[in-house]
Amino acid sequence: LIAHPFIDRDPGNGIRQIADEFFEAAGIAGSEITLCAELGSLAAIKQLAAAGLGFAIASKRAIHRDVEEGRLVAIPLQPRTYTPLEVIVPRDKFRSRLITAFADYACEEFARMAREEEEA
């Protein structure tokens, strides 16, 4: 990847942080990466990648349709990366049964999705 132009997300973006951590774990310094664009819009990033102007890192779900329709090709990173997700609720306020039930459901659903992803 080092020899190819990289289309990065804007600073502070979660995917950018995951990409930075991936490169760091692989022993690739930021100065070794050929940055060709730094954008806040995922749609713009996908358009640049589809036009052949560089490669980008995006979540599987964010590019699913583009891959399915043949505009982009996805190459899984090795080792795999994961986006940590958390359910957020008010800190010191009363939590209704509905909020608690939703939080429990969301956690179960995220776990199910992670299992499916590992099996794929």
Which positions does each model-derived feature cover?
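Hydrophobic hinge/microswitch elements
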Residues: G12, D20-E24, I28-L72
